[in-house]
Amino acid sequence: NEQLGEITFNLDVHGRHVTDRLPVVELKGLIASVDYSRYRYENITLDGEYKQGGFNGKVALDDPNGSIYLNGDVNVSSRIPTFNFQAIINKLRPHDLNLTSKYPDTEFSLKLRANFTGGSVDEMIGEINVDSLEFMSPEKQYFMNNMNIRASKQNNENQLRLTSEFLTASVEGKFQYHTLPAS
């Protein structure tokens, strides 16, 4: 990856590999810094296990331009990818982290709980819950207490429910989720 640069870390790594199977690797320790996309991310703590193509455990980033704490299980290598995790994002500044060229001097915070399956947005089955979403920029400030998105499939029809303090919506039928914003 051209965007990946120097990495400084102190990790305990224990692994095993059996022929014709994905390796099992336990990781615990600190990535002091990693250069990615012309930015040096600092203080990344890992405590988890890479198994069968997925990661189960905790990842924490404590960077001057935001903190992220993830705890749970993500497996994108299984036949049907699975996501079951919690995340806390605090004062993240995506422009300063070189994640986007847009939104200078903007930061956001939120708590997220996700439990869903699917390899794309159109295959999603499950639930995402966002709490305490806070967005701050020089021009705007926004706060939302809670938003819940639930996607299911019944009788070969998609069902999507969105619930928040300012909107409750439900869509059912034969559609693809990615086409909804343009509708």
Question: What are these model-derived regions, one by one?
Answer:
Residues 1-113, 117-183:
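Interface amphipathic segments
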